[in-house]
Structures are given as C-alpha cells and as structure tokens.
Amino acid sequence: RRLWAEGRAEAIAPYVPEAVFPLYREAHAAGQYTDFSAAGRCELALLRSACRGETPFGQVRGISEGLEHRLEAAVRASTTYDELLDALTTVRYPRARMRRLAMDAALGYAADSFPSLPPYLHLLGGRKDALPFLKGCSLPASHSLARLRESGEACARMAEAQLAAADFGALCRVSPEAMGSLLRQKNIFLT
C-alpha cells in the first residue's frame, strides 16, 4: 500500500501476478485508488455530522464498555483523521479495532445492521464453466447486487451496507466516481 500510495505503480510489480499487472497499471493511471487524505477528511466529516443527541454512537456495531463516549469525545476534539485515531487508540483498544469502529460509526452501521452470516453470494468473477455449480447453492447468488438486494430483508440490509461502503470508497479515490458504481459493475469471466 505504501508503495502504491507514493505513486509508483511499477514498484508493486514484484508483488502481483504478471498477468494482472497491466490492470494495476491501468487503475493507477486512471486514479482508481484511494486518496487516504480525502478518505480521512470524509470519514471525519461523516462522524462530525453524526455527533448529535445524547449518545450519538450508542448503537454502532462493536460499541461496548463506554467506547461510544470515547468516540464522541475524540470526534469533537480531532481536526484530522490521524488525531482521531490517536485519541481512540490505547493498549486495550488497538488502532486497527478503532479504525474499524470509526468507519462503522461513519457509515452508520448499527449492531443490528447485518445478519450473523452473509445472506447472499455476490459473484464478482469466475470461470464460465463453473457457473453451473452455483445452482446448488442454498443462498441467492448473482453478479448483480440490485438483484440480490431484492432477495429478502436480510439481503436488502446487507446490500445497502455494501453500497454505502462502496460509495464512500468511490468518493475517496484520487479520481472520484459517482454513486452506485457497484450496481453497474460488470462480472469478470475468465476463459
């Protein structure tokens, strides 16, 4: 990630399969990667806008042991995303956990936002000759998130959460993209 963020797509060549490296080079040239500075500002802005009411983060997924108060105080005092994470991180609460907690709060993921197990199989790519195996799945399976979203209440909740995260990611790219790109994403078939 560090090599990629420093703007050197060629530096990651030894770490990715040779056959797909042209896709990485193309994505880098098009700005289809995260601008972490923009992502931090966007996340902090979402957290600040959610910082209303008596316990604004009380229902966030993963909140326990008074973390909602710690998160609220950190959001109110921080001017950068790194300051926010520094204020949240302790020996007891590692930075990775606090990063996930802050993102869940920014995206509005409540404890009951998701079912305990994935309600569908979102097919991103595969081999055409393997598609018949999907007929034996007990879960709905499709490349279309719009179709999966219509497969029941649990699927709709999960798809909306997936769309929120994808839209956040699309906004925080070096070359930002419009909302809903995940709904227009094409399946990749290998031959």
Where is each model-derived feature located?
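Active-site cores that bind ATP or allylic diphosphates and position pyrophosphate for catalysis
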Residues: 1-191
